[in-house]
From Swiss-Prot:
Pfam families the record matches: DUF2057
PANTHER family on file: UPF0319 PROTEIN YCCT
Annotated signal sequence range: 1-21
Protein name: UPF0319 protein HSM_0266
InterPro entries, sorted: UPF0319 (IPR018635)
Family of the protein in this entry: Belongs to the UPF0319 family.
């Protein structure tokens, strides 16, 4: 009887804990760059593109909106500046979405008012605080977490002071330790950027890129 009671209590505890957790996903044109002060784990987000939230916590995600857009008869890749989005957790599943960007007018409108929508699966709009994360220097994305930590310490609109000093990556299931120092060499900016992003990618992505590059010859 004691064993049965203990098992029942454990099951109730797990059920209670799960009831207060929601899962965040995004529209196809959004990439997660950082979650609660930590760099998003590309390997995990590549397959699930989701993370957990708790209704008792304030959460913060840094996102980038990316779209292939038309410029006359040509197409090009548009990538927004990183957007910091802060919101209160919920026990419902949540979708973070951005408007579809198809042409130059859409891009201009989004640049004039860059924002995303955070909505529960039941259709409730979740209040957010949003702001562009300003970055400086060559390859600013390489210092995203440091820049975010400084932002969170600044008391800005969407800052969360608890994330000003990033926690160790092992504390979060979707985070990973920063890679070692990345060294790039090249005769121009484009070559250096290619080297940098190649070293940031996982092995599968690197292999696909190499195959693609061979086919361009």
């Amino acid at each position: 009887m004691k064993f049965s009671f203990a098992a029942l209590a454990s099951a109730m505890l797990l059920t209670s804990t799960a009831a207060f957790a929601g899962i965040v996903t995004s529209s196809s044109n959004i990439d997660f760059l950082a979650i609660d002060g930590q760099k998003a784990n590309k390997d995990l987000l590549k397959s699930t593109k989701s993370f957990n939230i708790n209704e008792s916590q304030t959460h913060q995600v840094v996102v980038r909106v990316s779209e292939i857009v038309r410029h006359g008869s040509d197409r090009s890749l548009y990538e927004s500046d990183p957007i910091v989005v802060t919101f209160q957790g919920t026990n419902e599943d949540v979708v973070i979405s951005a408007p579809k960007l198809e042409n130059e007018r859409d891009i201009k409108n989004f640049k004039d008012s860059p924002s995303v929508i955070v909505k529960t699966n039941s259709g409730k709009i979740i209040a957010t605080k949003q702001e562009i994360l300003k970055q400086e220097g060559f390859l600013p994305g390489a210092n995203l977490i440091d820049t975010l930590s400084e932002y969170n310490a600044s008391g800005s609109v969407a800052s969360v002071s608890n994330f000003a000093t990033a926690m160790p990556a092992v504390a979060l299931g979707f985070a990973k330790a920063q890679k070692g120092k990345v060294v790039v060499q090249g005769e121009n900016i484009a070559e250096q950027q290619l080297q940098f992003w190649f070293q940031q990618a996982d092995k599968e992505t690197q292999a696909r890129f190499i195959n693609w590059a061979k086919n361009q010859k």
